[in-house]
UniProtKB/Swiss-Prot annotation:
Name listed for the protein in its UniProt record: ATP-dependent zinc metalloprotease FtsH
Organism in which the protein naturally occurs: Slackia heliotrinireducens (strain ATCC 29202 / DSM 20476 / NCTC 11029 / RHS 1)
Entry cofactors: Zn(2+)
One example GO MF annotation: ATP hydrolysis activity
Cofactor note: Binds 1 zinc ion per subunit.
Listed Pfam families: AAA, AAA_lid_3, FtsH_ext, Peptidase_M41
Chain ranges passing through the membrane: 87-107, 234-254
Residues on Extracellular side: 108-233
Amino acid sequence: MSETPNTNEQNNPNNQQDGTGQNPMPPMPTGKPQMPERPERHNQADGAPKRPGDDDRKSERPTWLSEFSDKEEDFASRLNTRPPQRASIITIIIIFLVAFFIGSQMMNMVHGEETDDLTTSEFVQAVEQGRVENVVYNAGEYTVTGKYYPAATAGSTIAESYNSAIESVDVKLGTILEPSNPSSVGIETTSLEEKTLGTERNYTATYVGQDSLMELLSAHPEVEYQVTLPSNVTEILISVLPMLLFAGLLIYFFSQMSKANNSQMSFGKAKAKKTTEERPDVRFSDVAGEDEAVEELQEIKDFLVNPGKYQKLGAKIPRGCLLVGPPGTGKTLLARAVAGEANVPFFSISGSEFVEMFVGVGASRVRNLFEQAKEAAPSIIFIDEIDAVGRQRGTGLGGGHDEREQTLNQLLVEMDGFEKNDAVVLIAATNRVDVLDPALLRPGRFDRQIVVDGPDVKGRVKILEVHAKNKPIGEDVDLERIAKLTSGMTGADLMNLMNEAALLTARRNKDKIGMDEVNESMERLMAGPERKTRVLNEKTRRTIAYHESGHALVGHMLENADPVHKITIVPRGMALGYTMSIPDEDKFLVSRSAMLDELAVFMGGRVAEEIFCGDITTGASNDLERATKTARKMVVSYGMSEALGQQTFGQPNHEVFLGRDYGNTQDYSPETAQRIDEEVARLMKEAHDTAYEILSARQEQMHTMAKVLLERETVDGEECQALLNNTWDEFLAKKQAEAAAKAADQAEQPQVEAEPVAQVATPAAPVAPAVPEAPQPPAAPQQ
C-alpha cells in the first residue's frame, strides 16, 4: 500500500537526496560567495519570457519534486477558483458584539485597578483637601474624571498621614527625624517634596450641576479644569444601538421559527424525484434476458406517447403495472430504462418514504405525489419496494387503524377511486407479492403483473455480453460456457461476476480478462474467497480429501445427479473443501429420482469418512442439514412418500405483518407427525446405503483420488474426468506421450535453424535434459 508523501519533508531542501541516498552538496564557488538564486516560475501560457536553460533545469529536477510542484500549482489554482463564502449579517453582528464585550472587559481588567470610583462627597472632600490635580467634566454623562492622591486611612488627618510617610521614608534611608510638633501640619524637611501623600491614581465620580462645580473649583485655582461636550453620534448610538440589537434578535428568532414551521409542514409533501430533462442513461437495449417484461413496458410507454393509436380501438391504458420477481433480476433496472426511454415526466420514490413517525404523513405524501403527477400529466410514477406500504390489511399486529393502512387506503383511492385519473400510470416493484393487499392487486389498479424471473441460458449470454461490452475480454473467454456454468444466477450476480473478474485481472497486472480470472471469480461467488493463510495438518487434509472424493464419486456414478466439474481441498470461505457440481441445463422441474440421488450425494462425504478414515467428523454437518431438509420437503410438501400418500402436511400461518412465513401450523395428529419422522429417517437411511454401496465397491479408485488431491489440491477439467472414470493411469500415459513428442520437436528445431548459419551451430546438448523430464506429468496450478 502506498503511503501519502509528507509535504513538510518534500518542501525542505535539506531533505532532498540524490540517487545514492545522500544529501547532495552544491559545489563551493571559487570567487565571491553569492546567495543561490531561487528559480522563478513563469507561466508560458501568459506570454512570460522563457529564460534559456529552463528546460534543462526542469529536466534535471527530481521526479518527485516535479510531481509535488504540479500538485501544489493544481491546489493553488483550485483554491483561487473556489467561490467566496458569504457570511450572514447576523453572524457578523454577533461576532462584533462579542469582540466588543471581550475588549471592554479586558480594558477594565487592565485599567480597573488604577481607577477609583468616588462618590460626590468624596470628590468634594478631595478637592477641598488639595488632593485633586485636574478635573475633566463630561457634560453629557455628568461625570468627572482626573488624577488625585487618595487619603491614607479613614479617620486620619493629613498631618498624621504626612508624618507617617516621612517617618517610613527616613527609616528606609537610615535616619529618624524627631518632629518638634507632631500635630502641626507644616513639617519642615529638606529631603522630601511636599506631595508625598501616596501614589497618584485615576478617579471617576458623578457630579450633577456644572454651576456648583465651577463654584467649587474657583475656590481652588490650583486644580486644572476642563469641560467636554457630548457627541451627537455617540448619543445616537447609545440610544439606537440597543433597539437595533433587540430588533435583530427578534428577526433572527422569527426566521428560525419560520424555518421550523416550514420543515414541519413539509412532512406531508412527497419526496419523489422528478426525472424530466436529466434522464438516466439506461435504455431498453441495456436490459437483457427479460424480453417479455421489456415488451410490456414498451407498450405502456407507447400508450402515453401515442394515445390515439389505442383510443380509436377502445383500449384503455393500464392504471398500474406491478413488477414481480426475486431480488437481483432487474426490476429497478427496468424502471430506470422506462425513465430513460419515456418522453413524459417520471416520478420515482421508495415505499419506505411514505412511512413516518407522525400520523397521517403517509396519506398526505400519497396525495401530494399524485397531485404532482396530475399537474405534469401524462406522467409515470414508480414506487420501489411497494410491499413496505402495500401489505395486506387486517387485525394482524398493528390493529385496524394502523398508519400503514391509512397510507394504503389513500393509495387505493388515488389509483382507482371516485375521481378519474387516466393520464397517470403507476409502476411498482416488489419481491413479496404474496403479502400485498388483494384490493391493490385487482384489475383497475394493478392491471398487469409482469414476472421478472431469473434468466435462462440465452438470457445469461445476453447479460454477459452487456456487462462485457466495455471490458477488455481475452480470446479464451467463452461467454456461452460461462452462461452454462452459472445456472441459477440472476442479472445482478452476473454483473458482479464480470466486475470481480475485472478486479482480479487488475490485481494480477494483466491487460485482458482471461478465463482463469472468470473461473476464479465464479468460485469466489459460489464458495467464498480462498483462505490461503489457513494451515491444516496432514490428518485433516487426508480426511477432507476422502470426504470430497466421496461426494464426487457418488455424484458421478448416479444417473440423475449433476455433473462434477471440480474437486478441491483448498479452504474457501467457511468450507475446508468443496466439490463443484453444475447442471448442464436449467431445471424447471425436479423428479423424485433426482431428489433421491441428491440425497445420496449429500451422504457421500459422511460415508467416505466411515469407510476410509475410521471415524466421522463435523465436516458433514451442513450435508446432513441440507439432506434432512430435502427429505422432509419430499414427505411434507411434495407428496413423494409412498407410506403417507399424495398429500401435504402443515399450513403456513397468516401473520401478514410478519411476512406470512413466520412459521407453520401443524394440522395433523401426533401419530401422523411420528410417521413423517419415520419416513424422513427411512429416506436418509436409503441414501446412506446407496452411497455406502458405491464407495465400498470402489475403494482403490477412492485411494487414487485422495492421493491425487493431496498432491495437487485441486483437479478440474480432464484431470477430474480421468479420476472419476478411473482412467488416471491412461491419462498420465497420454500426458507423458504428449510431453515426449513436444520435447522431441524442441530438440529438432535448433538443428534445422543451425544449417544456414555456421557460426551459430551448437550441439543439441541444451535440450537433452528435457528428455528425462518428459515422463513427469505437468503439475496443476496451486491455489
